[in-house]
Regions:
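N-terminal signal peptide c-region/cleavage motif recognized by signal peptidases
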Residues: 16-19
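Bacterial N-terminal signal peptides that target proteins for export
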Residues: 1-9
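Short solvent-exposed beta->alpha transition segments
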Residues: 24-25, 31-35, 47-95, 106
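Conserved short acidic donor-positioning loop in nucleotide-sugar-dependent glycosyltransferases
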Residues: 44
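Short helix/turn-capping signatures at newly exposed starts of structured segments
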Residues: 3, 21-28
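Short, linear, compositionally biased motifs with a strong N-terminal bias
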Residues: 11-14
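Exposed beta-sheet edge and beta->alpha loop/turn motif
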Residues: 88-143
């Protein structure tokens, strides 16, 4: 399982590396957006998920790097997926976490952090991490 930790770090790094300036795309419904991303990943479509995430955060150049990290899920069977956290902080910031069990792989969490702007919600951060023993990965959620 340590491999996924390296991949999760790389996925985070891919999204914070400076790229050509682009504006984040406002998201009308963070709940629907998060659900869609997890669904795309579970359908073994890492390219589509990477493109959507990278374009939404305003870093289209990060798509190829992110796809490489998401490919770990390409041959995995998503046995169970459910939203486990949806925390809204006074309509200004919001965190959504999905939990998935992947047969033969283990437990994976997908985290989406959204922030409100004058134009609407933006995806400020996306990451994923595995955890076997605890309910949530350490330092992964704001609880």
């Amino acid at each position: 399982m340590p491999k996924i930790l390296k991949l999760a770090f790389g996925a985070i790094l891919a999204l914070v590396v400076p790229a050509l300036p682009a504006e984040p795309v406002p998201i009308g419904n963070p709940d629907k957006f998060s659900e869609e991303i997890v669904e795309i990943i579970s359908q073994k479509r890492p390219r589509d998920a990477a493109d959507l995430i990278a374009n939404t955060v305003g870093k289209p150049d990060a798509s190829d790097s992110l796809q490489k990290f998401l490919q770990i899920f390409e041959d995995k069977n998503f046995d169970f997926t459910k939203k486990v956290i949806d925390k809204d902080y006074n309509g200004a910031v919001r965190q959504i976490v999905y939990y998935s069990y992947l047969k033969g792989f283990g437990f994976v969490y997908f985290r989406f952090n959204f922030k409100m702007t004058s134009t609407g919600w933006i995806l400020a951060h996306f990451s994923f991490k595995d955890e076997t023993n605890e309910l949530f990965p350490k330092d992964f959620t704001d609880r």
